[in-house]
């Protein structure tokens, strides 16, 4: 337990103090790891508060930290009332179904999903599912593709221009095309997932493909010559070469790419949701902007902070996985 | 978690027993009940207070009582909304009265859209920016220090002429080419001698700015105040709460409500595609039933339910503007200049004066305005106007829904027109700002009364 705790950077000095080791040194570490970030945050909050009270928009004053807290509470309350309404909805539905079966025994009762509005928490969930689906799809394409072109200098030169051209394309440019193509190709009477989800997912995929492809290719291409020689001496087959030599040695670079990709995926998703009116945090922001109520700016600010926090958490999770699977622990510290 | 599940299960069980009991009790009464062919429906709307019948039918459970499970979804703009009804992503929607007509005759997107339910009367206003207002004000007669309403466009004319002389375009916003707002703004401008411009679809010109003194262009309703604040347009015609929003934000002044341009004018309708209506006739009837009840609730006891309705509308998933902004117009008042709040009890009418009944004469008025401004580029016979109105407006469906409500005892026969004798034509209507009388049975004769506008065989 203590070893697990002491692995987390900001907890380890506390653990050491508890053990009675090097008290003054550890206090310094604590100030550095906790005190400084806290001070930074405080200064930021103060500047924010001061700036907010000086900006007057036609929707009222710019929201300060206090308004954001109020709005967060409001959004949470809304979430719970909506859940209660959903429960009542299902109850009424059961009753109605039962009454109908009574009259019409051939009727097969069906429970329909709640028809009310998605709450803020639901929107966060939708956004997370969408971004992860898009990201996983992109990784499934990008890693194998990166390995293949990384292994062959010729293939790399052949595909490089395509990659370089598509890499800087903004999601906003892809979106109309993706929307039209998805509408044309994804036709079914009872679709498993909504069209809007597929559109967002593919847009995210197209935009976050490239960092992984490039980093994987570079990682694969820069495997130490010695390792390649070993593989040749052992006469490993292509697949075995990839599995035993290429993958393990290029993993730090692959993960650097994946982290960049996930960051881009998250940013792209919010833009795509805003523009295409696809459910999620982006749509939440847009809807609030359209509403133009005196709470709107505060709510948008809540979303901004949520988006930031989630982006940060996603990055940390990737970093953790990277540390777990990577042999070169020094390559992934930031 | 398990606790909640067991709780829910016991609840459902007792509910089942209860329901079974109720069903046996009421069985003979409803034995002939029909079931909707399609129970899960998705309706679109635009964030405007006159979507209220939809929100109320949902929140008050009227849809559910008809066995319909409805999802309401805000749409980005009128074009997206119409396209989604046409391609079936939406089962129906809150539409501009001109939209089903425009779509059916093929101005804009061609598709056969019908309506069996008129959602409300009045509810729009024309707002100008503070700057234009201060220029207009000197031309408006005052009484007790307050401007005399209704304000005619005559007061705006010198301002527009000044812009024209300076070579600057005078831009105004409306929400859609076939919107009520477009026709009302045009009517008001033309009544004051300002030419709002012609359309010429046969030449591919759908901008509506030929010969125009004031250039009108499309902006989605919720973006109107922001667009005017940015200086792109000097004024606009839009539904609530976007006129009152301008007052609250202090960026503009509403000059006239549409009630003053044409007393009790038909505004929004509930539109569905003809194909959808043919496929799901029972569902359609049930939807209309639920919405008639919602409209009746909105106007019941002299607007007694309006504050509750405003509370519903101010939720973020519906209109989402502040309670006070929506309440201003929904509870029968209208604020012109800041502080100049006046009674307009009929600003939003949802049910009284047979507001929900789809009158042919209403449809024909819109068609006459389409002809007047060139959206219909050729002369049409009076019969054509009649046939088109009958193709789109469906009082027969409305009547069957209303009759069921009367039979079920939910509403009274005196709440409705007498279906046995109703022709669908309102008697000749006065109450227009320019005092021209409208008789729906003589559209061509009506067109001849306008000084500005196409008539007879005229063509752009």
Q: Can you describe what each PLM-predicted range is?
A:
Chain B
Residues 2-18:
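N-terminal secretory signal peptides and thylakoid transit peptides that target proteins
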Residues 16, 90, 233, 292-296:
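Solvent-exposed alpha-helix faces
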Residues 22-31:
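C-terminal segment of classical bacterial N-terminal signal peptides
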Residues 33-211, 215-217, 227-264, 418, ...:
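Short, glycine-/small- and polar/acidic-enriched structural segments
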Residues 126-127, 269-272, 276-277:
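Short glycine- and hydrophobic/aromatic-rich loop-to-beta-strand nucleating segment
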Residues 181-184, 220, 224, 242, ...:
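Internal, well-ordered alpha-helical segments in soluble enzyme and binding-protein domains
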Residues 279-396:
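Secondary-structure end/capping motifs
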Residues 364-460:
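Conserved C-terminal helix/tail region of periplasmic/extracytoplasmic solute-binding proteins
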